[in-house]
Amino acid sequence: MASLDSLVSFFLSTLFVTIVSSQTQCRNLESIISFGDSITDTGNLVGLSDRNHLPVTAFLPYGETFFHHPTGRSCNGRIIIDFIAEFLGLPHVPPFYGSKNGNFEKGVNFAVAGATALETSILEKRGIYYPHSNISLGIQLKTFKESLPNLCGSPTDCRDMIGNAFIIMGEIGGNDFNFAFFVNKTSEVKELVPLVITKISSAIVELVDMGGRTFLVPGNFPLGCSATYLTLYQTSNKEEYDPLTGCLTWLNDFSEYYNEKLQAELNRLSKLYPHVNIIYGDYFNALLRLYQEPSKFGFMDRPLPACCGLGGPYNFTLSKKCGSVGVKYCSDPSKYVNWDGVHMTEAAYKWIADGLLKGPYTIPSFHWLCLGSKIKSKESLDT
């Protein structure tokens, strides 16, 4: 039987290894490269906009909570990518567009609010036209490739940089569906799903060929819980609402349909590239959890209304959005899930980020990345 001294020695050595491991976790991930839309945009839309026609995210109350000034984020404070950067011990990821003498050594963000996965010309051919931003995923990726000589120098250095980066692919594709729903193309939205997924998959493959080894690919949020959609498709038919959350079930069903198809494609890619970590980010269930039991996680009992908005049961009006004259925001955004009718509050984004980084909302679990670049979870995306 082992002596007490040897057991104590083993325990202390194990504790030391655990402490050292926790302090140095994820050190192999040296930067973040990001693509996407407003969920991930840290200031690109503002950088691309005419100074006389800036988006609302260039003004307060956007940014009031953490930064205490507007940053171009579609939030009152930090967003998911900020919490990921903090977890990895990296600085907040700077926007590429509009940055003058930006330091992109530890990260670069190409995500633009309003961006689509598909080119706008493809959407317009289907009668889907919603002018906001024409910086599609393809354009973001093209810009990234064109900027490589300035970001990393030689082809070898660039391959190393991409290989040691945490690449966040989205969320992207949500606006393709949003814009279709906004112009009443509800019967045609499902036709966009394979097109969007193919575009995302092609971008991942292109980045893998360039040396990419670690990807986070988020799915879509529960659209039926969005104050925008709850206002747009408000109905007296109670059967269309989930009795627990008050969300529109048919829209959430669509989100789940898309997410299942996306996961299937990521599973295919994982088998095709076994040396690459391709992680699915379950934004849907992470956010839905807050709508199911808001008070358990520190949010108010009625989580559907927006913090910043005006009018109606969801504190949201299409013609008077957050940032417009006369539109006020709540006194305590940390108690709200929804920020402006479309995007979430910093508090909700922190919950989602924690669920990705430390909880059950990634497949495979995020912590496998922190054990070294050569270690990969054997958990299947089928589970």
From Swiss-Prot:
Similarity field: Belongs to the 'GDSL' lipolytic enzyme family.
Signal peptide: 1-22
GO cellular component assignments: extracellular region
One annotated GO molecular function: hydrolase activity, acting on ester bonds
Catalytic machinery residues: S38 (nucleophile), D340, H343
Species the sequence originates in: Arabidopsis thaliana (Mouse-ear cress)
Compartment(s) where it occurs, according to its Swiss-Prot or TrEMBL record: Secreted
Organism lineage string: Eukaryota, Viridiplantae, Streptophyta, Embryophyta, Tracheophyta
The enzyme's E.C. designation: 3.1.1.-
Protein name: GDSL esterase/lipase At1g28610
